């Protein structure tokens, strides 16, 4: 093959490569704009349809929240996990408000009906959201924080930074105490290729994972519909990807140690069949929070929050009631560790 022929082949190869790259770039760009923005008109429509509650403008964007219960009741704040927004707490409002508590749940940035700022979606962003939200809705109040999965890490980090605001912690299958090796997640963390996968296929991936969780929910169809609705708007996949890359999902031990050094009451609830945040990590948690009360359940997994809401809300009410006991009427205390079969 002569020099001219070699040059022709190289030019053809470069042309094909450039064409493929352009196609990939255009598909990436188009996929990012295939869904509408979550703007004021979209939120108004959600409220009119009875799908959303209240909104508030905070430093990094608009936040969707639900606040119910007696105005003078102790404030209980419910913090959701990595991908499922605040609807995961829907079954907790009735029992907790009936017990006299004011209950607040909200969508973290990038989830549910809250804004999708550019990020990074790290611990500082979620912490600032909660700081700003409490300053706006409950200034100068002490709160009882309840966190599920990544929300467990969020409330623990908050307690380690703002100890004077937190009366108690309830941690349900809390993340932040060790990483679970997953080749798929490691692939998503890689620059460029992870961005492209999430932009092109991320919503299908997240829907598939939610569909598995929904099978055990009391109302699977309702759960999946509520989960999918947040994906109707631009930015959800990118928010989760940024969280995977920048949030200390497996490396929050220092915050647990700081929060655990306090005399603040802590309750931990965990399913021993949890494959997302393995129950084995409870050993590390109890070493960092030796005064915590641990309740574990052999047959339940990571979805214990929404599959066993009656059980979990009952434990929460019992725990919170113990904080309200009068000095001359001591509350019934649980053993530091309790395992239920």
Placement of each model-derived feature along the sequence:
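Acidic catalytic loop of the alpha/beta-hydrolase fold
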Residues: 248, 272-277, 302
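Conserved alpha/beta-hydrolase catalytic His-Asp/Glu region
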Residues: 33-35, 185-186, 199-261
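Alpha/beta-hydrolase fold catalytic core
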Residues: 2-74, 98-101, 253, 321-341
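Short beta-strand/loop motif that positions the catalytic acidic residue
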Residues: 262, 268-270, 274
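Catalytic active-site module of serine/aspartate enzymes centered on a nucleophile-bearing elbow/loop
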Residues: 292-341
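Flexible "cap/lid" loop of the alpha/beta hydrolase fold
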Residues: 160, 168-199
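Active-site loop/oxyanion-hole signature of alpha/beta-hydrolase fold enzymes
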Residues: 52-61, 66, 98, 108-146, ...
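Conserved HGGG/HGGXW glycine-rich cap/lid loop of the alpha/beta-hydrolase fold
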Residues: 61, 68-113
């Amino acid at each position: 093959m002569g020099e001219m022929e070699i040059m022709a082949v190289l030019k053809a190869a470069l042309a094909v490569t450039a064409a493929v790259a352009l196609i990939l770039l255009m598909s990436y760009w188009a996929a990012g704009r295939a869904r509408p923005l979550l703007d004021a008109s979209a939120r108004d429509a959600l409220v009119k349809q009875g799908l959303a509650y209240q909104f508030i403008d905070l430093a990094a964007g608009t936040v969707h929240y639900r606040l119910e219960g007696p105005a003078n009741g102790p404030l209980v704040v419910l913090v959701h996990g990595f991908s499922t927004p605040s609807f995961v707490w829907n079954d907790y409002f009735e029992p907790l408000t009936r017990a006299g508590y004011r209950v607040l749940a909200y969508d973290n940035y990038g989830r549910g009906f809250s804004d999708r700022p550019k990020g990074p979606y790290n611990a500082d962003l979620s912490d600032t959201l909660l700081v700003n939200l409490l300053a706006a809705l409950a200034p100068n109040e002490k709160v009882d924080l309840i966190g599920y999965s990544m929300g467990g890490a969020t409330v623990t980090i908050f307690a380690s930074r703002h100890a004077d605001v937190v009366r108690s912690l309830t941690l349900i299958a809390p993340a932040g105490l060790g990483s679970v090796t997953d080749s798929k997640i490691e692939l998503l963390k890689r620059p460029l290729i992870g961005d492209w996968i999430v932009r092109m296929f991320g919503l299908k991936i997240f829907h598939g994972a939610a569909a598995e969780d929904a099978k055990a929910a009391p109302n699977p169809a309702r759960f999946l519909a509520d989960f999918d609705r947040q994906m109707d708007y631009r930015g959800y996949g990118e928010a989760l990807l940024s969280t995977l890359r920048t949030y200390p999902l497996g490396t929050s031990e220092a915050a647990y140690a700081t929060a655990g050094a306090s005399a603040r009451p802590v309750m931990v609830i965990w399913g021993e069949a949890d494959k997302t945040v393995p129950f084995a990590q409870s050993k590390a948690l109890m070493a960092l929070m030796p005064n915590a009360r641990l309740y574990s359940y052999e047959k339940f997994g990571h979805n214990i929050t929404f599959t066993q809401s009656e059980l979990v809300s009952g434990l929460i009410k019992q725990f919170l009631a113990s904080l309200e006991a009068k000095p001359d009427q001591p509350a019934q205390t649980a053993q530091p560790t309790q395992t239920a079969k």
